[in-house]
Regions:
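Conserved helicase RecA-like core
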Residues: 1-234
């Protein structure tokens, strides 16, 4: 609402992951179409030259991971002079991923006159410290949720000596349609993809060691129904 169609960056959104940056950019793009407002996601794993060309063509909102945002700022391909809004999404996730120094470096170079919105599932001390240091008289809005499980989700716990065999029995008897399986580690994802593949299941893995192009290909196959099972780290 307060972003104009002037061809300079007016809002910065920090996200912990490439996937979230892309998702946020897509949603902002839908909203901004009628106002001729462009949003651009920037992240590692994509050629920086392509991002620089898009930035030079003129965008109003940039969404990105802290490391890549900082890279552009140091190259002067992202200029902070006209930033009116800063959004920090999933701040505690960025803290866990070791981005807090990059976040602080970006925040301290922004114009003093701006609005900052910081979203976080938890408020650990380093995040609170950032709010006190770089926000003016911030208001804390806390949402207390008593139900920790979505009401339409049924949960079942299975005790089994062989997880893969137990999973295959579930796939054969109980589960129809698309399925997402979460594993604790990237190695666990790769091993389960191989184990299910040797048993004839159409499964693909998704984790941080894949390039962005590989991730995009996996997601397209899953959405199109060419793969039944998506195995991922969270």
């Amino acid at each position: 609402q307060n972003i104009t169609d002037h061809r300079h960056i007016q809002a910065l959104v920090m996200t912990p992951t490439r996937e979230l940056a892309i998702q946020v950019a897509e949603e902002i793009g839908k909203i901004g179409q009628t106002k001729r407002v462009k949003a651009l996601p920037v992240y590692g794993g994509q050629p920086i030259d392509r991002q620089i060309r898009s930035l030079r063509s003129g965008v109003q909102i940039v969404i990105g991971t802290p490391g890549r945002l900082l890279d552009h700022i140091r190259r002067a391909t992202i200029k902070l002079d006209n930033i009116k809004f800063l959004v920090v999404d999933e701040a505690d996730e960025m803290l866990d991923m070791g981005f807090v120094e990059d976040m602080e470096e970006i925040m301290k170079n922004l114009p003093a006159e701006r609005q900052t919105l910081l979203f976080s599932a938890t408020m650990p001390r380093p995040i609170l410290s950032l709010t006190k240091k770089y926000m003016k008289a911030p208001k804390l809005v806390a949402i207390h949720k008593e139900i920790v499980t979505a009401p339409l989700v049924d949960q079942f716990y299975y005790e089994t000596k062989d997880k893969v065999d137990g999973l295959c029995r579930l796939l054969d008897v109980e589960i129809n349609g698309k399925l997402i399986i979460f594993c604790r580690t990237k190695k666990g994802v790769d091993e389960l993809v191989i184990a299910l593949g040797t048993r004839g299941y159409l499964a693909e893995g998704l984790h941080g060691d894949l390039s962005q192009n590989q991730r995009d290909r996996v997601m397209k196959k899953f959405r199109a129904g060419r793969v039944d099972i998506l195995i991922a780290t969270d």
